């Protein structure tokens, strides 16, 4: 969260004419499903059993649909953000969504955004970029995002949530968040959004030239 990968990936996909896939949104949608159905998303057995009733679709306009309903805004609420990281560690949830992600990538030219794409979801992807930024920089970006929505988040709380999520995601038993050996690392700590988009676009174009 806050490294800028979603915003950058979305913009780069538009520039290159690729389809943008936000895998994090899919995990958020699963979390939201449990809340809508009135059960605890952290009840792993119940959530795993419910997966067969969940249909998630993404469109080229960045909308996310949960069983036909547009939940693009609902999945961005802070309550969902806090619960999604533990939910994404559940093996059955990961298997369910990874299968959907691979299916989509097979049929389209995509830029896929997520925390284990290059190592687990698409290990043979032509281009892998591992985007990083300091926790402090990421927390400031998240605070600005919430303020733009009219919310008043506490910087220290956001910073701690980011650090906790990083720890959980890099230490989970199934497909932890690590940089793929063949990934290019891009540190956006000292970049604004436009610079991040430009750097990423150039990396992709250079790599595509190499692959010709």
Sequence positions of predicted segments:
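ATP-binding Walker
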Residues: 2-3
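Walker A/P-loop
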Residues: 6
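N-terminal phosphate/diphosphate-binding loop that engages ATP/GTP or pyrophosphate donors
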Residues: 14-77
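Residue-level signal for inorganic ion chemistry
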Residues: 24, 68, 97, 111, ...
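ATP-dependent NMP and nucleoside kinases share a basic, alpha-helical "lid"
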Residues: 72-84, 88-149
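Glycine-rich phosphate-binding loops of nucleotide-dependent enzymes
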Residues: 128-136, 142-145, 178, 185, ...
């Amino acid at each position: 969260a806050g490294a800028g990968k979603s915003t950058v990936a979305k913009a780069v996909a538009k520039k290159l004419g690729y389809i943008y896939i936000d895998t994090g949104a899919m995990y958020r949608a699963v979390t939201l499903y449990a809340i809508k159905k009135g059960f605890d998303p952290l009840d792993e057995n119940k959530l795993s059993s419910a997966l067969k009733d969940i249909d998630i679709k993404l469109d080229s306009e960045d909308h996310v649909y949960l069983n036909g309903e547009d939940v693009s805004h609902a999945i961005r609420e802070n309550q969902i953000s806090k619960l999604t990281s533990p939910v994404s560690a559940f093996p059955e949830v990961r298997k369910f969504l990874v299968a959907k992600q691979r299916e989509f990538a097979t049929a389209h030219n995509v830029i896929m955004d997520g925390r284990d794409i290059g190592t687990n979801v698409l290990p043979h992807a032509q281009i892998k970029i591992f985007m990083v930024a300091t926790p402090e920089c990421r927390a400031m970006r998240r605070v600005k995002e919430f303020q733009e929505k009219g919310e008043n988040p506490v910087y220290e709380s956001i910073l701690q949530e980011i650090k906790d999520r990083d720890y959980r995601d890099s230490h989970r038993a199934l497909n932890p968040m690590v940089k793929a050996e063949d990934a290019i690392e891009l540190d956006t700590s000292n970049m604004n959004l436009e610079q991040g988009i430009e750097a990423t676009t150039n990396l992709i174009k250079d790599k595509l030239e190499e692959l010709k």
